[in-house]
């Protein structure tokens, strides 16, 4: 059902897709969609969560293996490089859904609430990452500014613009992320 929702929420779009269409695409009764998700908003929320992490495991983001990998590394660039690889993998998986969500947020209150929650969750995650990076001793800006820079740089729309629109190889996107963030974090406020 999530695959069907992902397909239809991207095209023709969230607002244009009734749950009956999701059910038909998934080959299930609409009652099944309601039984599993309750409503369209919850279906969208679950879809965003699953595309973000790549599975439906109930594991907090801070407990995911890539976070342990980053924490085990030393040095600003090493940590950013590992995060950039995770970021590119995540964006490749979620770009279509997240762009559809961003578009739907301008016209639909439920989508707007989910988009806002996603932005806030990402900002909290980047605040935790900024604190970890500060421990390297190489960050010369405030943790608040570091979190803001990380939050902006990791936005899915950057991946869309550079990789999908401009045709950058993923490796170049990863280098751009590391170089851009390291340059700002390593320069005094």
Language-model features: where?
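Short helix-capping/turn signature of helix-turn-helix
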Residues: 103-108, 153-156
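Amphipathic alpha-helical packing segments from all-alpha helical-bundle domains
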Residues: 85-102, 109-137, 144-148, 175, ...
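Flexible coil/turn residues that form the inter-helical turn or adjacent wing/linker of helix-turn-helix
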Residues: 15-16, 155, 166
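Helix-turn-helix
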Residues: 4, 8-42, 46
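Conserved catalytic core of Hanks-type protein kinase domains
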Residues: 36, 90, 152-153
């Amino acid at each position: 059902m999530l695959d069907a929702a992902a397909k239809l929420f991207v095209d023709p779009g969230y607002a244009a897709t009734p749950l009956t269409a999701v059910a038909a695409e998934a080959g299930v009764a609409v009652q099944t969609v309601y039984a599993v998700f309750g409503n369209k908003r919850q279906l969208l929320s679950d879809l965003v969560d699953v595309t973000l992490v790549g599975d439906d495991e109930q594991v907090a983001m801070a407990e995911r293996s890539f976070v342990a990998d980053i924490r085990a590394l030393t040095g600003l660039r090493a940590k950013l490089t590992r995060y950039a690889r995770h970021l590119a993998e995540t964006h490749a998986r979620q770009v279509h859904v997240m762009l559809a969500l961003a578009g739907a947020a301008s016209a639909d209150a439920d989508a707007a609430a989910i988009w806002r929650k996603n932005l806030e969750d990402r900002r909290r995650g980047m605040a935790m990452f900024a604190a970890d990076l500060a421990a390297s001793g190489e960050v010369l800006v405030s943790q608040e500014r570091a979190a803001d820079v990380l939050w902006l740089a990791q936005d899915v729309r950057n991946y869309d613009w550079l990789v999908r629109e401009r045709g950058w190889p993923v490796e170049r996107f990863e280098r751009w992320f590391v170089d851009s963030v390291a340059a700002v974090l390593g320069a005094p406020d």
